[in-house]
Amino acid sequence: MPRFFHTLAAFLFVLAFFSTACAQQLGFTIWKGENMVGGITAIRNHAGVNATYAVSSYSELEIVMKQVVRSTMALEYRAGRPFAGFTSLHLNGSLRDSSFMRNMAGTLNCFVHPKEHFTMKEPNAWSTARMYFEEPVGQSTVFVESVMRDCPLTRTAEGVYVLSMPGKKSNIYRYKDGLLQAVEVDRMFVKLVFKRA
């Protein structure tokens, strides 16, 4: 990721924590089976039709050997649409995945680790960051920040949604009375559940 992108990414994340009087903060615990292995903090700041989201997580997993996983995501909305954002995933201190997006003259320039670069005009107003705070009622796609693309969303029961992502990955989101209660993450070597704290 070019140096400019690192600078803007840092700015976005700091912006999400600025103006705490307008901030909404949520906490989730991360579970692997019966063991709590980490936590997630999600923050949203509103300024009219603009908003900034920041989501950070930390977990320690035993998969063959100890794995320390840290993830960070920030997304800025302007006029109700994603405008700029980034994600990063570190495994045992080393960068494993990242993505970055910025708006240039009305076109979103997207970069996905390690070398993918593409542009898009206008992503979905719904994103995984927004799904921490609102139930995506009536939505058939959601913008996924880690891949910088709209991905299919399927409602399978009342308050239950399956988000399908590239690589045959999927997450199950469970809501009650419009509030996110849990996210089930099923990957090749590990199954995790994020539970509302």
Cite the ranges covered by each PLM segment.
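Short, structured coil/loop segments at alpha-helix boundaries
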Residues: 2, 61-64, 117, 168
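Bacterial N-terminal signal peptides that target proteins for export
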Residues: 1-9
